[in-house]
């Protein structure tokens, strides 16, 4: 019969698990490899309690972030279409292109919510028209709206 002990992983290990995972390993593996190389710590009653408290705090922070993202998405869901004016040349071609900064500032002026460039997904826009604009907060929190490019005459 092999002696198995419980350890808490401090680093991601392909064959055991990710950081914070509680695993049972043979005592030789733990004391000769994992613990001396600071890959794991011995799972005592105190360290398990501390680990559980840490996981609870981490989950609470994730829930708060999820709630904030959900509230932001609700604000953006109220917007069905935004319009941007651009200077136009021949054949309804716009000068330059519509970039993320313009969209972010336009949405900020409407909602008061700041977005990052990585949240905005829009096609390459070189002409007047209506395009789909996607705002992706997380894989399950997404907002779609229309982006209308109008001519601007100076």
From Swiss-Prot:
Principal localization reads plastid
- Single GO BP term: translation
GO CC: one term?
ribonucleoprotein complex
Q: Does the keyword Ribosomal protein apply?
A: yes
Q: Could you give a GO molecular-function term held by this entry? A: rRNA binding
UniProt keyword annotations, A-Z: Chloroplast, Plastid, Ribonucleoprotein, Ribosomal protein, RNA-binding, rRNA-binding
Q: Please describe what this protein does.
A: Binds to the 23S rRNA.
Q: Which family, according to UniProt?
A: Belongs to the bacterial ribosomal protein bL9 family.
Q: What is this protein called?
A: Large ribosomal subunit protein bL9c
**Lineage summary:** Eukaryota, Rhodophyta, Florideophyceae, Rhodymeniophycidae, Gracilariales
- Source gene? rpl9
